[in-house]
Amino acid sequence: MDAGLLGEWFDELAPIGADPSGGVTRLAYTPEEDGMFEKVASFAARLGFVTAEDCAGNMHISFPGGEDAPCHTIGSHLDSVPRGGMYDGVAGVLAGLLVMEKVRRLRLSISVKTVAFRCEESSLFGLATAGSGVVTGSIGIHDLERAKSASGQSLGEAMKKKGYNPGTCRLGGIIDFTELHIEQGRVLWESGEKIGVVTAIAAPTRLKATFLGRQDHSGATPMDLRKDALCAAAEVILAAERAGRSEMGFATVATTGVIRVTPGALNVIPGAAELGIDVRGIDKESVARAVAAIREAILTAEGSRGVRCGIEVTSASDPVTLNEDVIESLAAASEKCGLAWRRMASGAGHDAMKIAPLFPSGMVFIPCREGISHSPAEEASLEDVALGAEVMLEGIKIRRETA
């Protein structure tokens, strides 16, 4: 695989959404995400490939004349979190292009294409894997209208504003699907292994918890007469952490990543608060227990603090087990390439989890420096991306031989 070509691509993409304080911001359906798609389309054109958009704005990269043929498909996403890293998602799309470039250069008789998905991150609209979810039918129009940015724009509106018509197409023509991704954890980095063959993907359950107390003067209101919404929320934040810790044996985690306080003034007792809580794991029952513990904590806070509380599940999906034939082929490919590897589960969600219920799917993880991701400090080596691409291509060859 041509790591030098990969480096040129990353260099050209680097200015898009570059944040002066570090990292890149390429949120879904913004000009920055558009810029990523346009630039990657130009890479494909230079190699002689053709591109097409679907009803959600996902980009399909094919060999000329092979647009409608069943293909071994590689893909990931091009959007980012605010001040995120260069490699999250992007490495997987460019690895797909790298595989296609080698197939073309060596004139291999393999039908392969690459898909770049829109809106994998939930940062702007609170709904993850939207591009892949729309074209697989797991995310509907109602879901898109419920998902809104802080400005009040729905995800459906954002899609339509770009000229897309979600709900009018379905993903097809896929023999199997493979996604390369940085691990976003420290396992491979600390073990020194080059490849993680993913067996299952954890699924997130997202909760919105609301707390309505009484807004009062912070100096004139005695401590025993307060109905502090933020204090009630704080109890739930710690309860969520305890819930995650109690399920560590099942690899379940719980995170409070969003806190909104009203009015948010130093001399005012908070009258209202809202939390965004993320619970995820590969064991459905374990996730359910953690969510139940958080619900119980909310009821307890409501009773003890005289604050009205509510909880809403904003999104939920089941953990996904990946295809054993694809897993075995990627394991065999790693051995064939002489690489140290391991089987592992993914704690983060990925587009592959939307594809897996419909088509045989697998994932390849590569290390990222110190396990850091969703951060300006995110880093992976070009050589590791190229090695991962080589494993995907060898996996395709193995599956073709054993089909």
Predicted regions and their residues:
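His/Asp/Glu-rich mid-to-C-terminal helical/loop segments that flank catalytic regions of hydrolases
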Residues: 201, 217, 221-246, 286, ...
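A short beta-alpha structural unit
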Residues: 26-28, 255-264, 276-282, 308-327, ...
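Midchain, well-structured core segments that form catalytic/ion-binding scaffolds
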Residues: 119-120, 126-285
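Alpha-helical metal-binding/catalytic segments enriched in His/Glu/Asp
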Residues: 74, 83-122, 205-211, 217, ...
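Zn-dependent metallopeptidase/amidohydrolase metal-coordination segment
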Residues: 6-19, 72-76, 340-391, 396
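Acidic/His- and Gly-rich active-site-bordering loop/insert found
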Residues: 3-84, 103
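Flexible, glycine/charged-enriched surface loops at secondary-structure junctions
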Residues: 52-54, 111, 166-170, 220, ...
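Acidic, glycine-rich active-site loops and adjacent beta-strand->loop/helix elements
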Residues: 78-80, 115-123, 184, 215, ...
